[in-house]
Amino acid sequence: MTKLRVGLLFGGCSGEHEVSIRSAKVIATALTKVQNKEKYELIPIYIQKNGLWQPSDFSQKVLNSDHPSLLQLTNENNHDLNTSLTQQSSSPLWQIPPQAAQVDVWFPILHGPNGEDGTIQGLLKLMQVPFVGSGVLGSAMGMDKIAMKIAFDHAGLPQVKYQVVTRSQIWSNSCVFPKLCDDIETTLEYPCFVKPANLGSSVGIAKVRSRSELETALDNAASYDRRIIVEAGVEAKELECAVLGNDMPKASIVGEITYNSDFYDYETKYTEGKADLHIPARVSEAIATKIKEMATQAFLAVDAAGLARVDFFYVEKTGEILINEINTMPGFTSSSMYPMLWEASGIPFSELVDTLIQLALERHSK
């Protein structure tokens, strides 16, 4: 049987570069398991933090290394290798390794800007090769918090109160800014969260409890993005549900996250011992069933495909279930919620990876 060549695309320019490498290592291992190694051949392609795509031999070294950042530093100083990749081009960042032409299906385990925002998906679509995950539209909507919320509103999914802010409202007119802050205080009250609309890794996000903190947070967020979203804070359980499929997606059991930090930021997410995962979530069957239903609705609302993790708030005092966000390319590390939820739902990791590849092939064939 001819093996399918899987291009594992990892690394990238975002703040979640290291998480991507960790996820790629686990996926690469899954592709070598007994049930997969007869079907798939791995072609790893590593994208450095500076955007340079590396050939598969060096990319495999990154996957095998316990200290990939040291390998990257060495390789950035390797003039001969980088020169050979450019093939006399004025911009090495536009060069794709020759092994990419051999790929039958891509698995882009990339996060954040230029990874899960539709840009890499557009490139892969131009290659006319199947790829795991959402397409250009679903990825872009899943990354942009404002577009995402508009889609959720249109689908009738309840959310926390929010207000959209632009950089020009913050920086261009000193008379407008105080009125803007007044409106936020009146509409959302404290505490509230200030977030750049189109960044991952919790970059630029702040929880604010006063006027001075609000002003500082808005100014900081505007330095990252020209569009900002401010959300009302809510005291609630934080629940997550994994979704798998294309046009008829299915939802996993529901998980719950607890932590001691001020909010679920990057450090809390990815530092061992900072957060506790409860699978299944400590909620009633009725609440879990409703969340699973809402998760698939959210998946379809943004035109996602393949996979997504959907996050919720459950306000126990009122019984409200509020959708928070969708992540169209969640982490695949050993401590990531997405694969753990499917494992608990009866789909082991190796089977999950196989299913995602098959879903990519199915979507491409239609």
From Swiss-Prot:
This is D-alanine--D-alanine ligase. Residues 149-358 form the ATP-grasp domain. Its cofactor is Mg(2+); Mn(2+). Pathway: Cell wall biogenesis; peptidoglycan biosynthesis. Belongs to the D-alanine--D-alanine ligase family. It comes from Trichodesmium erythraeum (strain IMS101). Transmembrane segments: none annotated. GO terms for biological process: cell wall organization; peptidoglycan biosynthetic process; regulation of cell shape. Mg(2+) 2 binds at residues 325, 327. It comes from the Bacteria.
